[in-house]
Amino acid sequence: MAVAVCHFRLGPEVWNTASMEMPKVKQDMPPPGGYGPIDYKRNLPRRGLSGYSMLAIGIGTLVYGHWSIMKWNRERRRLQIEDFEARIALMPLFQAETDRRTLQMLRENLEEEAIIMKDVPDWKVGESVFHTTRWVPPLIGELYGLRTTEETIHANYGFMWYT
């Protein structure tokens, strides 16, 4: 057996108990004079800064960034000039060291050439192959011809950490 559940409750003014008719529903009516105006526009609160203030902040950021870049470029240029001056001052020392190392290697090569070619008649140790009286800087192969392969590779390619 099903039990009916009433989802709404009608008051005694609506329920007519004498005739047991269908209840009459009281209809709500607007108040006298009608309802007031309804505000239907979107009313969102302001969020964040205004456009002008964001534009001002953006321009200020750009100006500050430009100023800091200019300042750093001036400092970098000053440091670069200092490095160039130090390099120019040390260049004669480096050139003298390179010349000393080259002459030492040429002397060692001449000694090795004298040992290797001692049995060859009419061989002049240290004779120039260029037939000139001017100084010609020796080539890498000429300097490192009698050296080990590792020394030649190091002279040609410099320091290689992966070998």
Swiss-Prot record:
Keywords: Electron transport, Membrane, Mitochondrion, Mitochondrion inner membrane, Nucleus, Respiratory chain, Transmembrane, Transmembrane helix, Transport. Coiled coil: none annotated. It is found in: Mitochondrion inner membrane; Nucleus. The chain crosses the membrane at residues 48-70. The keyword Electron transport applies. GO terms for cellular component: cytoplasm; mitochondrial inner membrane; mitochondrial membrane; mitochondrion; nucleoplasm; respiratory chain complex; respiratory chain complex I. It comes from the Eukaryota. GO terms for biological process: negative regulation of DNA-templated transcription. InterPro entries: GRIM-19 (IPR009346). Its main location: mitochondrion. The keyword Membrane applies. Belongs to the complex I NDUFA13 subunit family. Accessory subunit of the mitochondrial membrane respiratory chain NADH dehydrogenase (Complex I), that is believed not to be involved in catalysis. Complex I functions in the transfer of electrons from NADH to the respiratory chain. The immediate electron acceptor for the enzyme is believed to be ubiquinone. Involved in the interferon/all-trans-retinoic acid (IFN/RA) induced cell death. This apoptotic activity is inhibited by interaction with viral IRF1. Prevents the transactivation of STAT3 target genes. Complex I is composed of 45 different subunits. Interacts with CARD15, but not with CARD4. Interacts with STAT3, but not with STAT1, STAT2 and STAT5A. Interacts with OLFM4. This is NADH dehydrogenase [ubiquinone] 1 alpha subcomplex subunit 13. It comes from Macaca fascicularis. The lineage of its organism: Eukaryota, Metazoa, Chordata, Craniata, Vertebrata. The gene is NDUFA13.
